[in-house]
Amino acid sequence: MTLHIPDKTLLERWLDEASVEYGLCSQCEGLHIPALQEVEGVVDSRLFVESYGLLLSTELEIRPMALLHVSADLGRLNMDFPTLKIFIDLVDDATPQLVLAGCLPVNAGITREQFAHFFAVTVEATAQVAAECLHLDYLFAAADS
């Protein structure tokens, strides 16, 4: 079993080997994940290599009228989805966002299988949170756009 400390190139290879579609942009260093970006309510989803490990971050656009409800529900969401860090991002002139982040420390090295497991678990949990938030009317639905 070979352990790797992944960089962006290795992640691209592992995603290719797993037939996971991803995209690059000139605005950030992340690998954009279309499978999550296509989920209703999702603004963006990216996989980053950070100094502490891998970060799979997804932003959901919160309806401003639901902000208080989402804020009150954060504790439950974080308990129900322990593999994610879930928090609200408020910026002065932008719509509030619910950020869902999965983190995998990799400085001791990981295998391709460990990465695949982290990726699959994080994508599934993220999709479940997005579906629940849509059901609770926390997010802008496609019909609202």
Enumerate the predicted regions with their spans.
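Short, highly charged C-terminal tails/helix-capping segments
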Residues: 134-145
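A short acidic/glycine-rich loop-to-helix N-cap element
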Residues: 106-118
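Charge-rich, low-complexity N-terminal segments
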Residues: 1-44
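Short, internal acidic amphipathic alpha-helical interface segments
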Residues: 55-97, 101
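Short beta-strand micro-motifs enriched in acidic
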Residues: 25, 48-50, 89-91
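Long, charge-dense
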Residues: 129-133
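Long, continuous compositionally biased terminal/linker segments
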Residues: 36-65
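Long, contiguous binding/interaction regions
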Residues: 123-128
